[in-house]
């Protein structure tokens, strides 16, 4: 990373003395997670790293950097040992998006036996219609304040990097105040949520959700084993089946609505139209039609989709050392989930895997 011509001023420095904390602490991590948006958290693939840990309680907050590319780091082993001791002495550990931080802490050998509290899950119980469960939005609601990001953004501009996705490249002096504030806000917000959870008679449900969070993180890290050799064999078999079906239709593009409409009309079939007069060759059209040629087109499309989405993408491309590591979501959140309280999954969505057809069973 090239040093800027004009270096922004920063007064923050890593702590020299590591303080004692109370038995209720908030923790927030800063990470290098290059494939987060595309594939979910990197802790399940080990393709990123933690660069610093922030801790806060009612009296104080600190940031402990140990992996910033730009420097200002503490000894990593010292930080991990200290954080482990803080957690062991705590009666509860607070997070904003606990599943993310718990997974990364696990890669450092940091385990939490105390109750885990996630303020975003708490807010989903309090207000299932909330526009956003981000830390910044919750700070606006409960604290009438927001995260202070200007210093971080100025430094990122000076070093010509992305303020959020690449902050790990900055010297820690430009990240420290921002990271500390994330932990500080998390702790403060939860103190406001506690009476609301009790007033709405949600405490028992809330405690159940808290117990579930570490279990789901463990499920993600454990993953589901897949047989890659059989997946390769199934991929070849389905490719051949699809090819055999497609040869019957010449140059017909089986994904083109205009071509499918014309082909179907040449067979004497009536094709539904939209209000604007465009052909509507939907799934319902294929299911309702009993013409053998149309059925073969539908079969070719189904095989293509199942093969590409589930065999090639999910099993062959998204596996890590022979396992699929999906993310599990307890509630609605800014990154997905449901408002009904039903568990959902993503990266990949395991609930979409077909199981009724012969191909689905093979998958």
Predicted regions and their residues:
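Acidic beta-strand-to-loop metal/phosphate-binding motif
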Residues: 26, 91-101
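Conserved beta-strand -> loop -> alpha-helix junction used to position metal-binding or nucleic-acid-contacting
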Residues: 111-128, 135-140
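Conserved "right-hand" nucleotidyltransferase catalytic core of DNA-directed polymerases
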Residues: 1-68, 113, 130, 141-143, ...
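Phosphate- and divalent-cation-binding pockets in alpha/beta enzyme and binding domains
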Residues: 100-107, 262-263
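Glycine-rich phosphate-binding/catalytic subdomain of phosphoryl-transfer
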Residues: 104-107, 132, 136-140, 144-148
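Nucleic-acid-processing active sites and adjacent nucleic-acid-binding tracks
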Residues: 58-93, 224
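Conserved catalytic alpha/beta cores of large enzymes that bind or transform nucleotide phosphates
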Residues: 363
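Short, glycine/acidic-enriched loop or turn micro-motifs at the edges of active sites
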Residues: 31-33, 99-100, 121
